[in-house]
Amino acid sequence: MSGTDTHDGDHSSLADKLKSPFHELKDKLKDTHLHDAKVHLNHKKHQIGKFGNLFNPQHRHDEEHEIACDEKRSGIANEHRFKSYFPEHDGNLIKWYVDGRDYFWAVSVALEQANETIYIADWWLSPELFLRRPPASNQEWRLDAILKRRAEAGVKIFVIVYREVEAALTCNSEHTKHALQSLCPKDSPGYGNIKVMRHPDHNVLENAADMTFYWAHHEKFIVIDYEMAFIGGLDLCFGRWDNHQHALSDVHPEGVANEVWPGQDFNNNRIMDFKNVNDWKQNELSKVEYGRMPWHDVAMGVIGPCVYDIAEHFVLRWNFVKRDKYKRDKRFDWIMLQGREGENEDLVGVQRPKHPVGDYIPHPLSPLETKKLKNRGTVHAQIVRSSADWSSGILRDHSIQNAYSEVIRNAQHYVYIENQFFITATGDQQSPIHNQIGRSIVDACVRAGKEGRKFRVIIIIPAVPGFAGDLRDDAAVGTRAIMDYQYKSICRGEHSIFEQIRAEGVDPTNHIFVFNLRSYDRINKTPAIRKQEERSGVEYHEVQRAQAEEIMSSGIHGSKDVEGERDKHMGKAEEQKEHKETQKSLQAKERFEDARRSDEETESTYSVAHHAMAGTGKLADEPWDGEPEQEVHNWVQEELYIHAKVLIVDDRIVICGSSNLNDRSQEGHHDSELSIVMEDTDRIPSTMDGQPFEAGRHAATLRRYLWREHLGLLPPQDHDASKDLNAQPPGEDSPNDIWDRDESYKFVEDPMSDELWEQWTTQATTNTETFRHLFHADPDDHVKTFDDYNIFLPPRGVQAGHIFDRFLPADDIRQKLDQVKGHLVWMPLDYLKDANMAETGLQVNSWTESVYT
């Protein structure tokens, strides 16, 4: 034995001596160009080799270590409710935000307080977005300005945005990346502190096996210092800022410096989509001709253990995109997560290739135990997601759908849904629709009906999906296809929710109610503006653009980003050209303002939308600077676009996040989504159907606030939110202001109250009839065939959204509009019921139908 040991030792010693020179040589070459060249060639070989994955769709899940990791993740998920990878947590402090004013203000405060890290995941991010309004007096609160300040202070900022298919969408994530990464140029404070990833990759040569054209990264969340998170439906982008009165008009005769929505932030997707968003100043939609499309949304602010889970989802996505797209890019490091070290680092996508490029950086940057995530509040919560191989490198996770289905199926009193879409199935017979949240609605209604129990499902969705075009036109077939799937989900065909309930001997009209939201306003194009245009030779539309150029200057951005790249707005030549155009525009604006006369001061306000809210007096008393017949031409209406993705059940449970109610969001392997399921353990005395009831504070106060907004029982909001608790980040010292200081709070306490339901339905009917009478708002139950459009709407080419009968007396219009309170209208369930809404063709066919569901 000893002889063998000696022999082996001598052999080993000889081998070491022979190897030693090569190891020493390898160490010496490690940091040289020769070594870099070798690594580059090695990575190039693997890059070219990715074409082989065309024949192996399971290439991320077929190696032994990948299989082991998948089994580990599945084992974790199988132990959790809804089969979510993330566990349930007690002790969360969660605050709700309704509409963009409050949310963006709170985000601006939270970002400004960041000390270590900021994570942002968005479908679309507009660097030039103003988080506070009006922009002219809030220059320092532009998103890119805030991020620049934090980067210069040493905060590490990580951003992941969806890389759009340019032919289909106008998000221009390339501009987002270059604009953000140019904020801190080389040799300046903050250099390298802002990193932006775009995904998925559309480079055929590098990513042929994993091309994703149909599906998007749709999450919208922020994590700050591992101490606070925001999650919901609001991207940090144009078109989302709004307040509770949801104004349509933004014309200011007293001076364009008072504008609220500059440049492309003033948008109406139903008339014209965003265009060339890298030129954020440009806006082809004239404010003196059209109203904007108002925006309703909901989000959450989180402090507590769920913050870690939201951060973990971001870290997994970051490392997955690093592996998938930036594996050979030293500018992007791997993120290691405290709590997922060692043998568990694969759970967050950390890889250890033979020739790693980029460092391995532990996060958070200070010890996790210093973050004080435990026992922060009273909300029991859980993160759920839609995620899969293409989006996160994991097996399919559809825990959002599981959560929706289970929570709805178990509802006892009511289900309240606000969502951008409503496309769902009741079984396996509604291809191409696969999610079966609709079956849960059927089951809950049938059970209640057979038990003789009062039970309501209240659904609020947009009247029309937010795509441009006249619904009569052939080009709108894609929009009509989405609407067709929604009607088939709700009430058309034997497999619809209505008919499945009716087949069980229960009347669906006693249980299911579907609504839209709609807003009106008056464009403040006064005679004074027309006179200024005549005297100056400058149209107000030009002044509108000049104002956007002045306050949305690109001067904050560098001429190149940190990668030495640029987009169309960057570079010396472009800067010089832009400067000349800006000077020309500003001179035109100056001529226009010089043409204003002191005796032409205006009394009419830029918007009268506040009259739909509480405590605002009568619209009949609102001043107008001009002849009555001129005012008639200036009234406009538009759908109030519901972009919220919120479910509230029985005043106890809330689900909120980025997930729409359709296959794209719910199936897991389509769009990627992140949502949070919440139930407050802090119970407050309440009433349910006339009986004493213990409601969850978080769910009940959110539902009461939303319902009062929709009924017009809340006051309008000022732009300045500095003294509003609802516009502050979550914290023990900034709870939600539930607005319980008038009788309306008590009025909406019982969601099943007959008195409340009578006002809800009566006001919806009044609003619907008013918009029909004055504007012939489209869509409408009077339009059952395409021929009906010839009677109901003005001829093609006539401006949409204005008063239908221009000969109506101005006073009659005001009196009618004074009856509109809130924004609630009935969804027209008979719209085009006798027509083929979506003819099969190039846009809608068996190859493309899944895109619309």
Question: What residue ranges belong to the model's regions?
Answer:
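N-terminal alpha-helical scaffolding segments that mark the starts
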Residues: 23, 27, 34, 60-63, ...
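HKD-type phospholipase D/PLD-like phosphodiesterase module
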Residues: 72-117, 124-407, 414, 418, ...
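Long, serine/threonine/proline-rich intrinsically disordered regions in eukaryotic cortical polarity
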Residues: 2-65
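Domain-scale recognition of functional cores that engage charged ligands
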Residues: 435-443
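Catalytic core of tubulin tyrosine ligase-like
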Residues: 652
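Glycine-rich phosphate/pyrophosphate-binding beta-alpha loops
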Residues: 660-666
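Long mid-to-C-terminal assembly/interaction modules of large eukaryotic proteins
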Residues: 521, 530-532, 538-555, 609-620, ...
